[in-house]
Amino acid sequence: MYQVLAITGYKPHEIGIFNEQHDQLPFLKKALSKKITQLKEEFDIKWIITSGQPGVELWAAEAAIELKSSYPDLKVATLAPFHNQDERFQEAVKTLYEFVWDHSDYRDYITKRPYDNPAQLRSKNEFIVEKSDASLVLYDSETEGTPKFFLNYALKKQHQKTYPIFYLTPDDLEEMIRDQLDDETWN
């Protein structure tokens, strides 16, 4: 049983998503919801933690918030790396961030000040790994991107003690999209 699951992955531009109307975004959100559900049921996850970073983290937090109606014991925590993280976000992303922040069961800032140096982002990854029992990462080893910084800490923790890292890969996403399209074709 893992009480606390950290979720991270790519920022939108790293996977070619440049707005909330992207045609594959609903599939990605559904895949995140499906994977969170699977891990919740298999390991009795109680908390989902993200930093509220645009992309996979916000979409996963949104999915977890929606899943709370089916799983009332599921809680969501948003641990932003610094104050005013959202001030440079595009309006649609800022709206989603505010929704996630407002609907999180716990929210706080890891560093208690506005952004002033990259060390705040490193400490975010380290802090979230330390506060979690397992992680879910949307990641492709051939397209490193920002998840690699989180994975550095997660792999380090995994070598020291039991710390499962669950992956959601582009191949997994493609398979889920094909399955969903097949289901829609037959229904």
Short names for language-model regions:
Residues M1-W186:
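Acidic/glycine-enriched connector segments
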